[in-house]
Structures are given as structure tokens and as C-alpha cells.
Amino acid sequence: MIQRKVIGWSIIMALGGFLFGFDTAVISGAEQSIQTYWHLSDLQHGFTISIALIGTVTGAFFGRIPADSIGRRKSLIIIAFIFLIGSLGTAVATNWYLFVLLRFIGGLGVGASSVIAPIYISEIAPASARGRLVILFQFNIVLGILISYLSNYLIGLLFTDPWRYMLGIMAIPSLIFLILLRFVPESPRWLILHKAQHDEARKTLQLVNLEGYEQEMANIIAAKNEEEKDVNAESLFNKRYRFPATLAILFAFFNQVSGINAIIYYAPRIFTMAGLGKSAALLSTTGIGAVNLAFTMLAIWFIDSLGRKKLMFVGSLGLIVTLGLVAYSFYAGNINGNYVTYLLMVYIAFFAFSQGAVIWVFISEIFPNQVRAKGQTLGSFTHWVMATIIAFSFPYITDKLGGGHTFMFFAVMMVFQLVFVWRMMPETKGKSLEQIERTLTMH
């Protein structure tokens, strides 16, 4: 049985995922108005959208530094402030340059939270429930996406020029996150590995695992002592970590070449391309958010029973088929907007059940305690670099090559993902972090 306090701490930390998802998707309802308001060229517009992702890449790359130096909890308090400043600032920005700067600052929070929050949850969760608890982060990402879509739709009905309200409303959950972080303890593994505060760590582990906390303490300390024998143990480039590093890079790469962020960012534009009106496009986008949430909830029930690998195998097959059909509908011409909407909803269902649910769980598990923050940074950095490239290039590519070629590229990439899952991806369900370390690292 999972202790209630562990669930509560995980839910609070997962609110970082809610802000991550809200910030990622809220721009979809405002992006066309922003282009009109500041008379932006396509290149300037692409830069305006992708600058948040550049901030995200930066936040992901440097997120491990505060996570290891001042702790997971204090780092997330700083991130909550960043979200608050970014949301309020973009809502009142008086010129394009300031708006772009504040979008970058908001992106820093998204990137850093994608590194630190999953680490924290994986480090306090018991092995039997780690998948379900870490997936709360992804659940909150898709909940944030859905709420942002719904918020955009409702605000769009209430105001004639709604984009500032769309962006500014995120200040409310940012403030709630900041307040709730006061009630969360520091990660016990961080306390042992970076501060040698064994007594403080023991108090938290006792709340997590009343019967087995002493053995868990012993396992963490033993793993730390083993790593300290290797003078290069803290370097992610140590040959011991080559396999988990490769897994993290490939997993994050395939996550983005599925086309998910292109659809999240540009869903209304895609539906307009498929023939839907503006209001119908926004409402269909909300439907995508609802499907995303529903199938993430379904994955929560199966990730610790079926395992990570089976979810990925099923999802990869579904993504290949749905992306191929979307590509075909664009190739065939005479596009039916409702048909494309249904296909993309099925696509989202397969993505949410597999890649969307598994990525933050899997990457947070596969690295040893000593380099977990660095490993999570590597995976997050790869994820956001690819997201930036796709978000920046998607409007240009669809304009020059059309929807058919664009979605066919995503489909082919999912064929490669299927091979990766089949041939390389290990199963991690039900294993302690120290057991996974012994399996995946070279000694």
C-alpha cells in the first residue's frame, strides 16, 4: 500500500507538470493573434513560438545544477517563481522584444521542471508504484494541456482580443504550486548522496516505507559507496553509463519525431488546413486534450502491471498506422476536416498510452543515483532540442512540402521507434532504482 503522504508529495511535485503542459499548449490559441498584433513575418512568428523552447532547452540543460547543489525542492520553488513571472509578464508585455524575452524565461521553467520533478518523484516512490507515481507528472502535463485548450476556448468566447488573458491566467496555478511546495520534504536520496544527512533522509524514508526503510537506506548507501570507488563515477561520459545514456537520447528523440509537439502547438492551424472554421478548430483542439488526458489515465493503471515496454510496443504500432492515414488524407486532397480530427484523436490516444506516459518514468529510472540529475538532463535536453527544431520548422515545412510529406516523415520515424523498442529497450517495472542500476551499467 502506498503511503498517503507519498501520494500527496507526488501530486504536489507533479503540479510542475501541469504548468509545463499549460505553458506548452496555451500559445496554440494565441499564436495567430500574436502574429497579427505585432505584424510578424513567418520567420519572426516561428521564432516567437520556438523561443520558449529555446528557453526550455536551456532550462533542461542547466536544471541538474540547482537540483544537485541546492536540492530538488528548493529548485522547484525557484521554478514556480519563474512560471509566475513568465505568465504575468507575457500578459502585459508592451513590445515584441519584451514578449520574446518573457517567453524565454517561461521556457526556462518548463525545461528545469522536466528534469527535477520526475527525479524527485522517482526518488521517493516505492518500486512497486514508481511508474504510477512518476506518471502523475505526465498526467499533469496533459491535464495542463487540456485546461489550457479549454481556457483558450472559453476566453476566446468572452473577449474580442483574448490572447493576453489566455497567457496571463497561468499565474493562478503558478501561485498555487509555489504555496504547496512548502509542505514537501527534500528527496531522501539527495540528502544521502549530496549532503550525507542520513538522519533527515531516514525520517522521510520511514514515511515512504515503514517496514523496509532500513534496508532501503542500506541499499542507497551501498550504491553510493560502490560509485565512490570509481573516480569518474560522477561523469556521465563514464563508459558504465553508455547504455542508459544511449537509451535516454533515443527515447527522447523518438518522442519528438512522432510529431506530438507540432500537433500540440499548431493544432488549430492543422485543423484549419483540414478545412475547419476557427471556432471549430479551437473546440477540436480541446477534444484532443481530453483524449490525451483519458488515455494517460488509462496508462496509469497499466504501466506497473503490463510494464513500460509493452505500452511502447502497442503505442508504436498505433502511431505508425494513424500518422500514415493522416498523411494519406493530405495526399488524396479533398480533405475532410472531421476525418482528420478523428485520426489525430486516435493518434493522441496511442501517444498518451505509450510515449507520453512512459518517457519521464523511464528516463528517471535508468540512471544510477549519483548521475540521475545529469542523466535526466541529457534526456530532457535531447527532448527539447528536438521539440524546438520541429516547432520552428513545422509551419515552413508544411507550407513548402504540404501536410502529406510532413506526416509521412513522422510515420516513418515511428517505424524506427518500433525497432528500438523491440531490440534495445529494457523492462524496468517492479525493480528498485538500485536493481536497475546493476542491470544497466557496466562494471
Question: Which residues are covered by each model-predicted region?
Answer:
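Solenoid-repeat scaffolds in large eukaryotic assemblies
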Residues: 200-204
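Short, well-structured alpha-helical segments
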Residues: 213-225
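Alpha-helical transmembrane bundle of multi-pass membrane proteins
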Residues: 1-197, 225-443
